[in-house]
C-alpha cells in the first residue's frame, strides 16, 4: 500500500487498494452492493481507522499489499497545516471528517467490486481543496494599505455592485486619506438626516459640521495679475431709450397664477409669494422680460462695507425669448448681436432685491457665467466672466455704483478676451486664479494663462465634436481633474497634466445638445444628466462608480450644487424643480438605496395656451429612486423649461436659491 504522509490535511492521491480486511469495516460487504452506502456502524469505524492512519508517521504503512508502479510521493495537491491551532481549526476538523467518510465509501466500493483498477478521485475533493487553498491565501495576504479592508478580502472590484458594504464602497471611491475621510464624516453626520432641507446652523463657520472647499479661482488674489491698470473694462453710460432701441425686451404683461392668486406682471415687476396651500414660503417671482440663458451668484462671504447679508446676482438675458428656433440662438456658428446682463443686489435676510445695473454688449448670447472670486478691488463689485456666441471668453469688471439707482451701461471693451482663430470656444472653467481650461467646437481642449492669454499652454483633441461642458473637480488631496462632455455623448475625465494617459470614459449616452455637468465639492463628485431623464453622480477618482440620483419622465436641463452642503437642485423641461440629497446616496451602501434616496418637487411651472397664462404649482411631491425606467419624456411648452438654477454659496445666504424658465420668470426662494 502507498505510504501516507503524516500531518497532511486532506486525502492523498491513493493507489488502488487490492484488498482491505473485513476487520476494518466491522461487517462484510456483499458483492452486489455496488454503489450502495455502507451501514452507519461501519461508517463510524471506518472514520476512526482512517483518522488513525493520518496521525501515523511517514514510515507507517497500511497492512495491505502495495500496488506496483505507483508513485507514492506525488503529494503536490496537499495543503500543509502549518498554522497550528488557528481560528479555523473547527471548520477544518469538520471538512476532514467529511473527507474521511467520502474516502471510506470509495474503499467500500472497491471491496465490493473486487477490481484492482484505479478509481478517479471524486470532484468534491478537488472543490474542497480549492476552497481551502483560497481561504489560506486570503488569510495570509498582507494588505497593501494600512487599514484597508478591501485588500484583505482579495476581491476584484469591477462594478459598483461589487461593493456591498458602505465601508468598502467609501474606501474604494474615496481612498484612505484620514483628513479627507474626516471631512466626509462631517458631511455624513451633519446632512444624512436632511432629506429635503438642512439646518441653517450646519453651514455656519462655527459648526462642527461646517465643510467649505473654496474653488480654484479663490485660492489667492489675482486682480493685479489678471486685470490691474492695463486691462480695465471700458464702459459708457446710456439712457433707457437708447437701451430699448438696442434690446427689445417683452412689452406685454404676463398673466400668472400663483397658488390661488391671479396676477399680471410687466417687465421689471416683482411679486412675492402669497400664502400658499401648503404654508407660507419666502420668496418672489421677477419678470426679467427676456430669455434667461444663465445666472450666477457673487458669493461675498465677508464684506464689512455692505454687510454679510448683501449678495449680487448676475442674470444673462436674451431678447429672442418667444422663438426657440430663432436663427440668432444658434450654437454651432459664430453670431454677433446685442444682448444684456442684469446685476441685482439682494439682501438674503429680508429678501429685498433691487436691479442696480444693466450692461449691454455685442457678444451675442452668453452662458457659463462665473464670477472670478479671486479678483477683488475697492471700486469693483466683482469680475464677471462668460462664454459668448462669438466663440470667446470675456472678462468684465462690474463697477460698484455709489448708490442703488439703476444705470444702463454699454460695454465697449472687455478687460480680457480669450479666443483662437481656428475654432470657437464653447465652455470653460477655472483651474487656478490665473488659468482656465476651455472646450472648443472642434472637440479640442486648451488651457489659457490669464496673464499671457495670446497662446494656450496646450491644445489637445479630446472629442470629435462640439464640447458642451467643461468642469474641474478640485480637492486638497488629489490633483485637479477635468471633465468634458460633447455632443457625441461621451463623458470623459482626465488630469490636464497628462491627458493622453489619464483620459477615462465615465459613460456614453445618446447625443444631445444639452448635458449639464457640475462638480459638488462636499462629496468630491460630478453631478450630471445623461442627456435625458436621469440625474447621476460619479466620484472623480472612481469613474466606474456611477450612482443614479433621480429619474424623471422629462429631460433634465439644469443642475445646481453648493460648496456648503450636498443638496442638489435639478430643473427639467416640464417646468419642475426638484431637490435631493446626494450624500445619502454616495455615503451609504448600495443596499436599500430605493428606500433611502428620495427627491422632492419644489415647484412646477405650467402654461395654458387657451388662457395664455403661466401657473406655478407649489405643492410638494416626493419621488422614489427608480433605475432603468423606460423614458417617458414629453414635449412641453417652451416657456416653462427651466434654463438655469443656482444656490447662493455663502454662510449667510446658503439657503437661498434662484431658478428661471424660458419665459424670463426668475424665481427666488429662501428654503425654510
From Swiss-Prot:
GO cellular-component term (any): nucleus
Positions of disulphide bridges: 375-383
MF terms in GO: DNA binding; RNA polymerase III general transcription initiation factor activity
Region described as Required for DNA-binding: spans on this chain: 1-158
Predominant subcellular localization, coarse grouping: nucleus
Biased composition, class Acidic residues, residue ranges: 71-100
Positions of region (Sufficient for interaction with TFC8): 159-672
Annotated region of DNA binding: 6-18
Highest taxon of source: Eukaryota
Task of the protein: TFIIIC mediates tRNA and 5S RNA gene activation by binding to intragenic promoter elements. Upstream of the transcription start site, TFIIIC assembles the initiation complex TFIIIB-TFIIIC-tDNA, which is sufficient for RNA polymerase III recruitment and function. Part of the tauB domain of TFIIIC that binds boxB DNA promoter sites of tRNA and similar genes. Cooperates with TFC3 in DNA binding.
Misc. comment: Present with 1130 molecules/cell in log phase SD medium.
Quaternary data: Heterodimer with TFC8. Component of the TFIIIC complex composed of TFC1, TFC3, TFC4, TFC6, TFC7 and TFC8. The subunits are organized in two globular domains, tauA and tauB, connected by a proteolysis-sensitive and flexible linker. Interacts with TFC1, TFC3, TFC4 and directly with TFC8.
Protein name: Transcription factor tau 91 kDa subunit
Protein's organism: Saccharomyces cerevisiae (strain ATCC 204508 / S288c)
